[in-house]
C-alpha cells in the first residue's frame, strides 16, 4: 500500500513539474513577409535554430503581406516578433508614408534587437529590351512591379525614384506570375534585389525560370544624385545571381533589415539569443546565404544596423549588452537603450 502511494506521489510530482515547465515555454508568434519572399525563407531557417537551442521559446513563423505589417502587428499586440527595416522605422518615427497616422494608435513601442542583413535594391527588364534602357530614368512611364504594396523593397525604390524625379506605372502582380508577365510584356520590369549581398529571393529565382531578365543600372549622373540624397550604393558581380544578367556588374541600393523582438523578451534572453546566433551562424549561412554578412562579422553588422536606426527607435538592452561585450558599442547610444 505504502509503495503504491509513494509511486503515485512521485508520478504526481513529475506530472506537476512537467506542467510547470510546459507553462514556462514562451510562445513567440513571429511575423515576417509573404511566402516566396527572402524574409520568409530567412525566418524559417532562424526559427528552426532558435527552437532547437532555446527550448524555453516556441517560435512560429507567421507570413504576412509584407514586413511593415509585422511592425504594425507587434505595435498592436498581434505578434511578439517582427521583421523590421531602417526604412520602416524611419516612417514610423516620422509618422509618414505607410505609417501616416499610425503612432497615435500604437499599444507598444517597437525596439531593435537583431540586425540580420542588408536588402540590396535594383531593377531588371526583359533581356530583349536591354538596349532600350541605359539608365533608371529610361523607365519613366513604364509598367513596373517594384514589390508588393507593404514591402520595404518597394519603399526603397520609391524613395530612389522620388530622388531622381521618376514617375512610373505601378503594376501589382502575384509573385509566382512575375516571370511570365515580364516574358509576355504584361510588365516592363521588376524590382531586383538580393539579401546579404549574396542571396536571391525565391520569387525572383522562380521568375528566372520563366523569362530572361537583364539588370538595369543607374547612370553615372543618377548615382551621383542618389549618393547626394543619402543612399548607399553597392556593386555586385553577376555571379551572385547564378545566371546571365547581361551586364558586367549590378548596382544596388542597400538598406538594413532585422528580425526583432520587444521588451516582452527579457534582456538575458535576447543576449542569449544573439550569442546562440553567433555560435551557429555558419549553419544559418549554409541553409540561407542571406546570413553571409553576419557570418563574416556578427558584432560589426549589429553596429552598422544600430547606426542606421539609433535615432529612429530604442535599442533592446539585450542587444546593447551583446554589443558592449563585443566592443562595438558607442557610448552616444546609452540614452537610446529601451527601459
Which residues does each PLM region occupy?
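Ligand-binding clefts/hinges and TM-proximal coupling segments of bilobed small-molecule sensing domains
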Residues: 134-135, 142-157, 230-299
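Pocket-lining segment of extracytoplasmic ligand-binding domains
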Residues: 86-88, 94-104, 112, 125-129, ...
Amino acid at each position: 500500500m505504502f509503495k503504491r502511494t509513494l509511486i503515485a506521489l512521485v508520478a504526481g510530482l513529475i506530472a506537476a513539474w512537467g506542467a510547470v515547465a510546459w507553462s514556462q515555454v514562451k510562445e513567440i508568434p513571429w511575423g515576417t513577409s509573404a511566402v516566396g519572399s527572402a524574409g520568409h525563407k530567412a525566418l524559417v531557417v532562424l526559427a528552426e535554430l532558435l527552437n532547437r537551442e532555446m527550448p524555453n521559446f516556441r517560435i512560429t513563423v507567421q507570413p504576412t503581406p509584407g514586413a511593415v505589417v509585422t511592425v504594425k502587428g507587434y505595435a498592436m499586440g498581434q505578434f511578439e516578433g517582427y521583421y523590421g527595416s531602417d526604412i520602416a522605422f524611419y516612417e514610423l518615427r516620422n509618422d509618414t508614408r505607410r505609417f501616416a497616422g499610425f503612432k497615435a494608435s500604437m499599444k507598444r513601442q517597437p525596439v531593435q534587437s537583431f540586425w540580420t542583413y542588408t536588402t540590396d535594391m535594383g531593377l531588371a527588364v526583359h533581356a530583349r529590351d536591354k538596349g532600350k534602357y541605359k539608365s533608371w530614368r529610361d523607365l519613366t512611364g513604364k509598367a513596373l512591379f517594384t514589390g508588393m504594396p507593404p514591402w520595404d523593397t518597394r519603399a526603397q525604390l520609391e524613395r530612389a525614384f522620388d530622388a531622381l524625379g521618376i514617375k512610373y506605372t505601378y503594376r501589382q502582380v502575384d509573385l509566382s506570375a512575375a516571370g511570365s508577365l515580364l516574358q509576355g510584356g504584361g510588365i516592363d520590369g521588376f524590382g531586383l534585389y538580393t539579401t546579404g549581398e549574396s542571396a536571391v529571393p525565391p520569387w525572383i529565382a522562380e521568375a528566372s525560370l520563366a523569362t530572361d531578365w537583364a539588370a538595369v543600372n543607374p547612370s553615372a549622373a543618377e548615382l551621383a544624385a542618389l549618393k547626394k540624397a543619402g543612399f548607399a550604393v553597392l556593386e555586385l558581380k553577376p555571379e551572385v545571381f547564378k545566371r546571365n544578367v547581361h551586364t558586367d556588374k549590378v548596382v544596388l541600393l542597400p538598406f538594413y533589415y532585422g528580425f526583432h523582438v520587444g521588451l516582452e523578451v527579457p534582456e538575458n534572453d535576447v543576449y542569449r539569443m544573439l550569442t546562440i546566433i553567433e555560435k551557429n551562424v555558419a549553419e544559418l549561412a549554409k541553409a540561407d546565404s542571406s546570413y553571409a554578412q553576419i557570418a563574416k562579422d556578427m558584432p560589426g553588422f549589429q553596429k552598422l544596423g544600430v547606426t542606421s536606426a539609433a535615432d529612429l527607435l530604442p535599442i533592446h538592452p539585450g542587444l546593447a549588452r551583446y554589443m558592449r561585450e563585443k566592443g562595438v558599442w558607442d557610448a552616444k547610444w546609452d540614452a537610446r537603450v529601451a527601459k
